[in-house]
Swiss-Prot record:
Organism for this UniProt entry: Parasynechococcus marenigrum (strain WH8102)
Protein name (record): Argininosuccinate lyase
NCBIfam families: argH (TIGR00838)
Record-listed E.C. numbers: 4.3.2.1
Cellular component terms per the entry's GO annotation: cytosol
Gene name, Swiss-Prot/TrEMBL: argH
One Pfam family matching this protein: Lyase_1
Molecular function (Gene Ontology), one example: argininosuccinate lyase activity
Statement: the UniProt record of this protein carries the keyword Thylakoid: no
CDD domains in the cross-refs: Argininosuccinate_lyase (cd01359)
Family stated for the protein in its record: Belongs to the lyase 1 family. Argininosuccinate lyase subfamily.
Keyword Lyase attributed: yes
Length: 471
């Protein structure tokens, strides 16, 4: 068409449009500023597509070789910093196509045969996320190992256990740390589930309805390492469930990290004093010279909002979209990329913190477990073991605690005579049973905080994580 638009991304539809884009609209419409993140995946997908076209007789073998060589040259240029797309390219797909045509000539125009940017970007995103999921899994394993190393060192260390942030019962410190290892394992399992649904190939669905070109979708999917192809072309190009699923799984990772971070922040305070932060993982105040601030866990706690926000943004983006592809989908990438980066950074930060950034203060922990009423439940258990109904024992011990508070003393400071005045079932072995270490040891039920049970779990997790490393 005379006077048509030429050059850049607009060249792909130049015969339809007579005027160029308004400069602001061109910038507003472009995604090249962030979707260049998908360059390696775009090249991988295009190479597999070119080879498939040749295997199906759509293009000649020598043309496929030219295309693949050109795409690999673009990869080299990118690594050397010589591939520099501009705003006129609009997105990574047009940037690659433009450069490919410049390198190999008109044969480069055949690469897009049998596909659309709609199925192309869906493929790129899935390839990208599949790799990132594997990386995050490795990071989570690292954090698990850091926690496990601390747990191994503190199998005989005790810490107050809390409910409602009130001291409840003494625990083995290793047991407390193992709880977070369990949470992180569920996170790994969830991310693994996401990976299974990410690993389905949309390439070949074209714009929305498939293509009359005789392609082999399964060949391309296999070459790219996908386990299956989408059965419905409309679903293939419009599905962003996997972005939401990843953001949801990442949000749970962040929630768990935030819980751990909050405990470290509290433990590092003078009010608790359970941990001492390393200079390598803390900062000072610009005004108060005595301060050592827990910036790492505070930032982790704060960054939760970013990942949670991306989940809400993605859900809101897709909720009203008709089939099939809509430009709204351009908004999935920055949310997905940032959710990944933020989550991975926070996992690494917490791993470093537990590897070399904090030290548990055993003296303060011992002082804490020996200076409260967290052994009150064990007094009730003592009576129950001697035939007293639990509810009666519970009420008796509650009255004893009140009496101790009035007299400003602890349970273990009451004499045997005072205990016998409360109930004749109390004997001389009571004081031994109320010692914090005895209280912890008594929790022998499976999954409990008893030292022997905790040792079993430490050994089990050492074996599990060793197998994960090998796998």
């Amino acid at each position: 068409m005379a006077g048509g638009v030429t050059g850049g991304a607009a060249g792909a539809w130049s015969d339809r449009f007579e005027q160029g884009l308004h400069p602001f609209v061109e910038a507003f419409n472009a995604s090249i500023g962030f979707d260049l993140t998908l360059l390696q995946e775009d090249l991988d997908g295009s190479i597999a597509h070119a080879r498939m076209l040749a295997s199906c007789g759509v293009i000649a073998e020598e043309e496929a070789v030219q295309l693949v060589d050109g795409l690999e040259l673009i990869r080299t240029e990118a690594a050397d910093g010589r591939f520099n797309p501009g705003l006129e390219d609009e997105d990574v797909h047009f940037a690659v196509e433009r450069r490919l045509i410049a390198l190999v000539g008109s044969v480069g125009k055949k690469l897009h045969t049998g596909r659309s940017r709609n199925d192309q970007v869906g493929t790129d995103l899935r390839l990208w996320l599949r790799r990132r999921l594997d990386e995050i899994d490795g990071d989570l394993q690292r954090l698990q190992r850091a926690l496990l190393d601390q747990a191994d060192r503190h199998q005989s260390t005790m810490i107050p256990g809390y409910t409602h942030l009130q001291r409840a019962q003494p625990l083995c410190l290793a047991h407390h740390l193992l709880a977070y290892i369990e949470m992180l394992q569920r996170d790994r399992q969830r991310l693994g589930d996401v990976r299974g649904r990410v690993n389905i190939c949309p390439l070949g669905a074209a714009a929305l309805a498939g293509t009359p070109v005789p392609i082999d979708r399964r060949r391309t999917a296999e070459d790219l390492g996908f386990t299956a192809i989408y059965a419905n072309s409309l679903d293939a190009v419009s599905d962003r469930d996997f972005c939401v699923e990843f953001s949801a799984a990442a949000s749970l990772v962040m929630a768990h990290l935030s819980r751990l971070a909050e405990e470290v922040i509290a433990w590092a305070s003078e009010e608790f004093g359970f941990v001492r932060l390393s200079d390598r993982c803390a900062t000072g105040s610009s005004l108060m010279p005595q301060k050592k601030n827990p910036d790492v866990p505070e930032l982790v706690r704060g960054k939760c909002g970013r990942v949670f926000g991306h989940l809400q943004g993605l859900l809101t983006m897709i909720k009203g979209l008709p089939l099939a592809y809509n430009k709204d989908f351009q908004e999935d990438k920055e949310a997905l990329f940032d959710a990944y980066r933020t989550t991975r950074d926070c996992v690494e930060a917490m791993a470093i913190l537990f590897e070399e950034g904090l030290e548990f203060r055993i003296d303060r922990l011992n002082q804490a477990v020996e200076s409260d009423f967290s052994n009150a439940t064990d007094v009730a258990d003592y009576l129950v073991a001697r035939g007293v109904p639990f509810r009666e024992a519970y009420q008796l011990v509650g009255a004893v605690v009140r009496r101790c508070l009035e007299q400003d003393c602890l349970l273990r400071e009451l004499s045997l005579e005072q205990w016998k005045e409360i109930h004749p079932a109390f004997e001389a072995d009571l004081h031994e049973a109320l010692a914090p270490r005895a209280v912890v040891s008594a929790r022998r039920s499976e999954g409990g905080t008893g030292f022997d049970r905790v040792h079993e779990q430490v050994m089990l997790w050492q074996e599990r994580l060793k197998e994960s490393a090998v796998g």
